[in-house]
Amino acid sequence: MQCALYDAGRCRSCQWITQPIPEQLSAKTADLKNLLADFPVEEWCAPVSGPEQGFRNKAKMVVSGSVEKPLLGMLHRDGTPEDLCDCPLYPASFAPVFAALKPFIARAGLTPYNVARKRGELKYILLTESQSDGGMMLRFVLRSDTKLAQLRKALPWLQEQLPQLKVITVNIQPVHMAIMEGETEIYLTEQQALAERFNDVPLWIRPQSFFQTNPAVASQLYATARDWVRQLPVNHMWDLFCGVGGFGLHCATPDIQLTGIEIAPEAIACAKQSAAELGLTRLQFQALDSTQFATAQGEVPELVLVNPPRRGIGIPLCDYLSTMAPRFIIYSSCNAQTMAKDIRELPGYRIERVQLFDMFPHTAHYEVLTLLVKQ
């Protein structure tokens, strides 16, 4: 992938950009094999990759510069701003949105937040695109609601320029810290969720729900999990740390009883909407802490699927699963180091199958799917 920003030394986010994709995959596979070296692995599946550029469905832009000439991108460690509108990880459809947002920021009088001076209002622009219909969700992250009336007044101009903006919100983040969003979300459109579709499964994206940033690879990850589950004798399963329900909704059948657990209520609202559309009555989603939910249960299903954040599932859940011993565990991880640590805490299980998914090209990061079977 060619990147003018990297070549000019202005952005170093894609640290592996000079390596061809096959070399990147080899290095990631070697890293994963090294982390799992202590465990016998029955089957190593071929790694899955997607496009090497234009694959991201989301942009998180720090807003800097002046209200007349805003910059959308990032701040270097020394506070110097960098405009990243030309980043080749973004699809071509993002360029006209960035181009319209710059004059809009001036029209609405949204003064960019100055980190050094702790002044200004507009902190971030968050943009997400649906692959299914090209609809977009735009979020303005503001320090306060001071400019809200001005933004509302100027909004019709932006909506006229960009009819693809289906969901528009303001998020209030009052704290002087590098935190992407606050708790308060104010909807400026009637529509509150973005419709997405992977492998004929309807998914919904709401402002404060996590969603994978590489749809081409994420859809293959979900389809693979579905294939693995279909090969197992399973009538009942849990989907822990389920997010908007991507795994559970793919794995569910009219015959499988499935419970999805996720702490974020916004994500659970998305999952419930999808389940209703699919007409799956034996599928239920609840907004709870996954570890607390599981460890309070007196019995476990045949299969527990976990998709934890980077920190892994942790010792309390590992201990519970070791004691209760479900026949199968499918572990989806964005941090193979913590996954390996967790597997070490599950000595009663062997690794049946492992597959690497290159969700984050040009970086050392990757996603991995592992099937564990009770010995």
Curated annotation (Swiss-Prot):
EC number(s) per entry: 2.1.1.189
Residues engaged in binding [4Fe-4S] cluster: 3, 11, 14, 87
Matches recorded under Gene3D superfamilies: 2.40.50.1070, Vaccinia Virus protein VP39 (3.40.50.150)
Keyword entries, A-Z: 4Fe-4S, Iron, Iron-sulfur, Metal-binding, Methyltransferase, rRNA processing, S-adenosyl-L-methionine, Transferase
Catalytic activity: uridine(747) in 23S rRNA + S-adenosyl-L-methionine = 5-methyluridine(747) in 23S rRNA + S-adenosyl-L-homocysteine + H(+)
InterPro entries found in the cross-reference section: 23SrRNA_MeTrfase_RlmC (IPR011825), MeTrfase_TrmA_AS (IPR030390), MeTrfase_TrmA_CS (IPR030391), SAM-dependent_MTases_sf (IPR029063), U5_MeTrfase_fam (IPR010280)
Top-level EC class: transferase
Positions annotated to bind S-adenosyl-L-methionine: 212, 241, 262, 307
Family matches, as Pfam families: tRNA_U5-meth_tr
GO biological process: rRNA base methylation
PANTHER family: RNA M5U METHYLTRANSFERASE, TRNA (URACIL(54)-C(5))-METHYLTRANSFERASE
Function: Catalyzes the formation of 5-methyl-uridine at position 747 (m5U747) in 23S rRNA.
Similarity comment text for this entry: Belongs to the class I-like SAM-binding methyltransferase superfamily. RNA M5U methyltransferase family. RlmC subfamily.
Name of the protein: 23S rRNA (uracil(747)-C(5))-methyltransferase RlmC
Organism: Escherichia coli (strain SMS-3-5 / SECEC)
Gene this protein is translated from: rlmC
